[in-house]
């Protein structure tokens, strides 16, 4: 499974591409950080982020895009910019029929380090180790994008099994409800 990991941001947006193999084998294919000037207007900054993400999607052809879910930050303006960057990337993926999955920072940290409260240094160290890199990816946005892609490679099979189980349970409930309705009808009839 080829996964594009995205650590969204306006000033720095981490992009990564990994290939998931058998078991927990993951290989890094590419990683970069898109930078936009803080003094540029918002629409053009978003366009630069979207253009880079679209180029990556068209070049690498991922099977899924994993984006960090933004749910709270101390600075509302930063949170808005981060969410907007993630949104334009999700839109670019949707236009290409590429599934988009959002993972929380704690899910990513737990998947990569085993600790949902790990710090950036721990995440970077584990990403370096998991991917067998000679040097740690820098800046942190690059490491975070790789961590997101790794997280999705490892969580995707579990998420698929859970979705299948939920669908099976919904179908069983539907059949049960139909049988119950038929029995009630027979008793009344």
UniProtKB/Swiss-Prot annotation:
Q: Which residues bind Mg(2+) 2?
A: 68
Free-text remark on how the cofactor is bound: Binds 2 Mg(2+) ion per subunit.
Q: Which UniProt keywords apply?
A: Cytoplasm, DNA damage, DNA recombination, DNA repair, DNA-binding, Endonuclease, Hydrolase, Magnesium, Metal-binding, Nuclease
**What Pfam families does the record tag this protein with?**
RuvC
* Entry EC no(s): 3.1.21.10
Q: Which GO terms describe its cellular component?
A: cytoplasm; Holliday junction resolvase complex
Question: What SUPFAM superfamilies does the record point to?
Answer: Ribonuclease H-like (SSF53098)
Report the protein's function. Answer: The RuvA-RuvB-RuvC complex processes Holliday junction (HJ) DNA during genetic recombination and DNA repair. Endonuclease that resolves HJ intermediates. Cleaves cruciform DNA by making single-stranded nicks across the HJ at symmetrical positions within the homologous arms, yielding a 5'-phosphate and a 3'-hydroxyl group; requires a central core of homology in the junction. The consensus cleavage sequence is 5'-(A/T)TT(C/G)-3'. Cleavage occurs on the 3'-side of the TT dinucleotide at the point of strand exchange.
Please give the name of this protein: Crossover junction endodeoxyribonuclease RuvC
